[in-house]
């Protein structure tokens, strides 16, 4: 939908997910096979409601793939996680978002798929409410400490770990400084051990305001989910371009709100000054990458690859790749054993992907 790291079209990609899920349930039953995430969707511009609806629609597609493969919902739903939804500075709305998400996922797993194990009805995620990296600013980066604390408070008030995330120098580039890491860690510790934000799981329960806001969030997200469902589900809504276009449109509309000062970002489009603090930070390492190593990285990697191809058994590689191609053309076959055989024979990732490209084709970007 938003990340752009996919190779194959949606349906072959779901086939690969199905094969992975079935194989892992048979051979690695305690492995968390899938981590559903709306974080990158919101970071790309989706609204809060789209984030929730699209994420749950994706989750529904994954659950359906497992059921269609003959798995019992109670055998695999408890092994699903959500790595994170998106976030924003609107603390009350993000608390309501998390409360609504828990309701909707539980109802989906129980009522649509008939689950009986309550573990499968829980949303398990390492990060609950947070501000998201798009809430941090390059201008006046120290303000991001205050922003992250707001996210940490929201997380603690919706039953999560009150992590003051991300570090304040997130917008300055990859690799956090020593100062930013310490401030982020200590802000989280202050929220937990001094402010005791995490002492109560759901302190807003029963509040007319919060319960109403949760209901409104749930109703809006459910309506969007139902719209996607009517299209045929998440896969169809990606294929017809609905979800990618909706994200792009929302991103454009938010940018217009920021530029028109309908939405405020302190130090960016309001409360600006002529005298700005010069923030210098001490990096964990002087350079993220050794410049000399970077200059020769491609050459060294090509040499390593040439050595691998020279020393491996060519017939074994060809046989493994041929087997993968045959089974890729059979939708009823599970590709995991073939993929494992390819790796054991020292087939390269490019060679494996090229075989699957020949069968599945490549995903084409949606025209926005």
What are these regions (language model features)?
Residues 17-71, 146-225:
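Mobile "lid/hinge" segments at catalytic clefts and subdomain interfaces of large enzymes
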Residues 4-24, 102, 140-151, 180, ...:
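Phosphate/diphosphate-binding loops
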Residues 34-39, 83-87, 126-132, 148, ...:
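Generic beta-strand/beta-sheet core signal
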Residues 56-59, 82-184:
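Glycine-rich anion/phosphate-binding loop at the beta-strand->alpha-helix junction
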Residues 189, 193-368:
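Flexible, glycine-rich loop/tail regions that form catalytic "lids" or insertion modules at the edges
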Residues 1-10, 37-51, 91-97, 135-142, ...:
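Short acidic, glycine/serine/threonine-rich loops at helix termini
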Residues 11-18, 28, 49-60, 74-78, ...:
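Conserved structured core elements
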């Amino acid at each position: 939908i938003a990340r752009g790291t996919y190779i194959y079209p949606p349906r072959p990609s779901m086939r690969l997910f199905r094969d992975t899920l079935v194989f892992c349930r048979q051979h690695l039953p305690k492995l968390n096979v899938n981590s559903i995430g709306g974080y990158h969707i919101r970071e790309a511009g989706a609204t809060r409601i789209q984030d929730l609806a699209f994420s749950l629609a994706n989750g529904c597609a994954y659950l359906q793939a497992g059921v269609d493969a003959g798995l019992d919902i109670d055998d695999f739903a408890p092994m699903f996680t959500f790595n994170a939804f998106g976030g924003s500075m609107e603390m009350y709305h993000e608390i309501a978002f998390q409360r609504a998400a828990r309701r909707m996922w539980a109802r989906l797993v129980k009522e649509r798929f008939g689950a009986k194990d309550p573990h499968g009805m829980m949303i398990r995620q390492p990060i609950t409410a947070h501000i998201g990296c798009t809430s941090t600013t390059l201008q006046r980066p120290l303000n991001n400490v205050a922003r992250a604390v707001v996210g940490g408070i929201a997380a603690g008030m919706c039953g999560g770990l009150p992590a003051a995330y991300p570090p304040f120098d997130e917008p300055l580039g990859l690799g956090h400084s020593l100062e930013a890491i310490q401030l982020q860690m200590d802000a989280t510790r202050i929220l937990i051990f001094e402010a005791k934000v995490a002492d109560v799981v759901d302190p807003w329960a029963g509040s007319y305001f919060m319960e109403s806001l949760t209901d409104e969030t749930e109703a809006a997200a459910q309506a969007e989910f139902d719209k996607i469902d009517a299209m045929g589900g998440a896969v169809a809504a990606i294929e017809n371009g609905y979800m990618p276009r909706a994200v792009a449109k929302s991103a454009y509309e938010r940018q217009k709100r920021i530029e028109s000062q309908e939405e405020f970002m302190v130090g960016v489009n309001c409360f600006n000054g002529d005298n700005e603090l010069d923030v210098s930070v001490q990096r964990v390492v002087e350079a993220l990458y050794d410049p000399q190593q970077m200059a020769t990285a491609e050459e060294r990697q090509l040499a390593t690859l040439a050595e691998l191809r020279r020393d491996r058994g060519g017939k074994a590689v060809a046989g493994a790749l041929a087997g993968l191609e045959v089974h890729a053309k059979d939708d009823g076959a599970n590709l995991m054993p073939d993929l494992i055989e390819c790796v054991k024979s020292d087939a390269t990732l490019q060679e494996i992907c090229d075989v699957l490209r020949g069968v599945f084709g490549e995903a084409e970007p949606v025209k926005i």
